[in-house]
Amino acid sequence: IKLDDSDRPLPGAVFNILKDGQLIGTEATDASGKITVTNVTEGMYTFVEVSAPAPYSKLTSPVCAHVDQAVVNGGGTVTVTAKDQKLPNLTIKKLDKQNKLPVAGTVFEIKGIHYGYHQDVTTDTSGKAVLTAIPVDSYEVTEKSVPDPYVLDETNTQTIYLGPGDDQQLVFENLKQPQLTISKIDADDS
């Protein structure tokens, strides 16, 4: 039985099925989250998830069940339950450092440290850029460009680990470029 992180059946998860270490088939869970293995004989059965339906992450460890001769002779059933968690989400928020108002148009580079994920995102009018269902990994988030009149801080990189089911937020703040206004008047206008 394949369940999601809320204990509801999860259809469409694909598993390799092994008996005593030998591949005997590949099956997908049905609408009720189940795979039924028929003609079972005594031995160790291992279920290795090959793919999980979006937005879930596949299991990183196999699920095992031993079927003994008493179960086979008695026509019994062995139930194995596997539970998936959703892939993580990341919200990047950009604020003006002085007035804390959102800043639209900031471009961020997101790099997965271990598995090669890479994407650039731009903050919207609410100052946010949202990444949904991204791989479980540690990420470096770096500001690439900012709209005028803000000052780019190229050393402003934040690192975050996103685990299964996480919904995290990073906040970046920038100062505006200082402005100097010079007014030229003649001596008669003092």
Model-inferred region functions:
Residues 1-190:
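Solvent-exposed loop/turn and edge beta-strand elements of beta-rich ligand-binding domains
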